Amino acid sequence: MTKTSSFSAPKGVPDYVPPGSAEFVAVRDALLRAARLAGYGHIELPIFEDTGLFARGVGESTDVVTKEMYTFADRGERSVTLRPEGTAGVMRAVIEHGLDRGQLPVKLVYSGPFFRYERPQAGRYRQLQQVGVEAIGVDDPALDAEVIAIADAGFRSLGLDGFRLELTSLGDDTCRPRYRELLQEFLFGLPLDEETRRRAELNPLRVLDDKRPEVRELLADAPLMIDHLSESAKAHFEQVLGHLDALGVPYVVNPRMVRGLDYYTKTTFEFVHDGLGAQSGIGGGGRYDGLMAQLGGQPLSGIGFGLGVDRTMLALQAEGKSAGDPARCDVFGVPLGEAAKQRMVVLAAQLRAAGVRVDLAYGGRGVKGAMKAADRSGARYTLVLGDRDLAEDTIGVKDMSTGDQRQVPLGEVVGVLRSELG
């Protein structure tokens, strides 16, 4: 009888196990690589922070803060929260460690789990995996374009092509107050429910992010921020678009876009993939020029993004593509006997030192069982070593794709395999 554990992963928290975890690693690493090629340094952030950091940084009226955060009191009765996003934590770290007093822009990349209490569904988890970048300290449209192009390059390096970039401008401090008044005037004239009216009073932009069809219909004629930009904000956005054109990054201007976090200003963007249905976003971000000062630091600008690793995997699946190599190893060793096992263990260590992924047949499972294990491993080559091979100082090398087997001198096999595996 098969035994089952009485424990399982919490609802909405996925496990990634072999062979599928190879896809996860490939997607994450490709997105990280795109940022590192642009000079972004790695930052590792705490899993939990002071709750006030997110309340102040993300916005107290946002759904993230009011409905989705995992918040609890620690044993010292301090209120802490599992991080729901990365930008606020990065800004806190930049201020705390004085990175803002060095060379600007500060360019950082990070990855890991983030936590939001949402209704679990495909690609929308309570523990979500993201890759993020932040570029802090320079208000330059070219930097906006660089950040966007990094995300675009990361997706394309995976072979993903069914996505599109949507972007808009949310204005700056010189034009947003007047737009806020216009929007509130419009919203207060609608038959809104009490909760939505409260949102309109606190932060009217949050109402534009309402996903309910009946509210979306009421908002059809709402004034748009992009039609009320200041001259400086308009010029900034036009320069961003010009840089994207020069970089060959395709885009669609979506004047109705509203991101779910309060700190965004000016350039705001999202990558969407229609193969994912209603939950089509695979990543997004924008500029947040007032956030650092709001958190107690210098009045420096910033721009960044968060890309969903889980959702990018679903987008690849929707296109019938795969990014990961499910093979656990390049070479699988099958020793026949104790003397052969001792020699094979040493050979495996030599191959690994040469950068070759190697696994061995352990447990005395017999030749037939060992060869089945070799086949399941996905290895390109299987090494077979017995007493006769030891006596002749050779080893059998089987190409698992063709079935061809040859004898190679033991002293040469590391160089031969390294050369053939590239």
From Swiss-Prot:
Main location: cytoplasm
EC number: 6.1.1.21
GO process annotations (BP): histidyl-tRNA aminoacylation
Enzyme class: ligase
CDD domains named in the record: HisRS-like_core, HisRS_anticodon
Gene Ontology terms: cellular component: cytoplasm
Coiled coil (UniProt feature): none
Catalytic activities: tRNA(His) + L-histidine + ATP = L-histidyl-tRNA(His) + AMP + diphosphate + H(+)
One Gene Ontology molecular-function label: histidine-tRNA ligase activity
KW Membrane (keyword) present: no
The keyword Hydrolase belongs to this UniProt entry's keyword annotation: no
Alphabetic keyword roster: Aminoacyl-tRNA synthetase, ATP-binding, Cytoplasm, Ligase, Nucleotide-binding, Protein biosynthesis
Subcellular location field: Cytoplasm
Subunit architecture: Homodimer.
Similarity comment text for this entry: Belongs to the class-II aminoacyl-tRNA synthetase family.
The protein's name: Histidine--tRNA ligase
Organism: Nocardia farcinica (strain IFM 10152)
